[in-house]
Amino acid sequence: VEQVHHISPDLVDFPGIKYILENHVPLALSDRSKELILKCRKYLDEKLAQAETPIYGINTGFGSLHDRSISRSDLGTLQKNLVISHACGIGEEVPTGIVKLMLFLKIQSLSYGKSGVHLKTVERLIDHYNSDILPVVYEYGSLGASGDLAPLAHLSLPLIGEGEVNYKGAKRDAAEVLREHGWTPIILDSKEGLALLNGTQFMSAFGVYCCLRVFKLAELADIIGAVSLDAFDGKIEPFHELVQKIRPYKGQINTAARFRKILEGSELMSRPKNHVQDPYSFRCIPQVHGASKDAIDYVSYVFQNEIN
C-alpha cells in the first residue's frame, strides 16, 4: 500500500483515485507542485505591485462591480467576503465521501500552480483531507457557470474559521475544531477566494464517484450475463468475433470478447445444442451492454479531462 500520495502535475486517473480513496492514502504535495505554487504566487504579487490598470477580481469588484477599484489594504477582505457571500447552499448535506473527493480534486487543481494561491492555503486543504475534517456542503446552489461557486464556498469556509465540519461522526463549528488542532484560520490574500470558488470540483466529485460505481456495475453486468447464458445452456455464436465486426462499435466488440473470455472452457457452452436460438435478451447483450459502455466511455472521458 502506498504510504503517501504526492500530489504532482502528473495526470490523475480513475484507477489512481480509486486506490487512494479505498486505501485511505494520505496526501502531500510533491516538491514540483510546491515550486509551481510558489512561482505562480510570486508572479501574481509582482504583477499586482507593478499594475497601473485594474486586474479583475484581484483589485476590482466582481460581476457588475468590475469597475469598482479595491484598495491594497482591502484585497484580503474582498476575498473573504467573496467566500462568505457565496456560502448560500441549501438542501441536504453532501455525503462526506463526496466532500472528501471534492477536497482531493480541489487540491489537485490548485497544485498545478495556475491559480495564484499561497502554498499554506493548499497545505491547509491537505490537512483537512488527511484529518477527515470535512466541510459541510449542501446539495443545491451551483449553477455550474463560472464554477460550483456555492458548494466550493462551503468547502472553503473552514479555511477561514467559518462554517461547519463533519468530524468523527459529529457536525461541529469549524472554528472549534481548528482550535483543537492548533490551526490558525487562513487569512486570504488577493485572488485566493476567487481561486477557491472557481472550479468544478463539486460536479466533478459526483461525476468521478458515479464513474467509479458504473465501471463496477458494467463489469458485474457482463459476469452476470455470461453466467446466466451458461446456466440457460445458451449459444456462444451471437458473441463470435466476426459477428461483431459487422457493426464495429467498440463497446459491442469488447462486451462479446469479455463473454467469450468468461465462458472459455465451459463444458455447458461447448456441448451440442438442440434449440435453434436463444431468447433475444441473451442474443442482444453485446449490443445493449456495448451501447452502455460507449456512453460510459464518453462520460468518463469528459470527467477525466475535467479533473486534470
Give the role of each language-model region.
Residues 1-52:
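N- or domain-start disorder-to-order transition segments that initiate the globular core
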Residues 11, 15-19, 23, 68-98, ...:
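Glycine-/small-residue-rich beta-strand-loop submotif within the FAD-binding core of flavoenzymes
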Residues 17, 82, 86, 98, ...:
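Short alpha-helical scaffolding segments that buttress acidic/His motifs in well-ordered protein cores
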Residues 56-70, 74-78, 85-110, 138-160, ...:
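FAD-binding core of FAD-dependent oxidoreductases
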Residues 93, 113-117, 219, 291-302:
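Alpha/propeptide regions of enzymes that mature by internal proteolysis
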Residues 114-140:
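FAD-binding glycine-rich core of flavoenzymes that anchor FAD
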Residues 151-260, 264:
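Mobile "lid/hinge" segments at catalytic clefts and subdomain interfaces of large enzymes
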Residues 229-308:
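Accessory "access/gating" subregions that flank catalytic or transport cores
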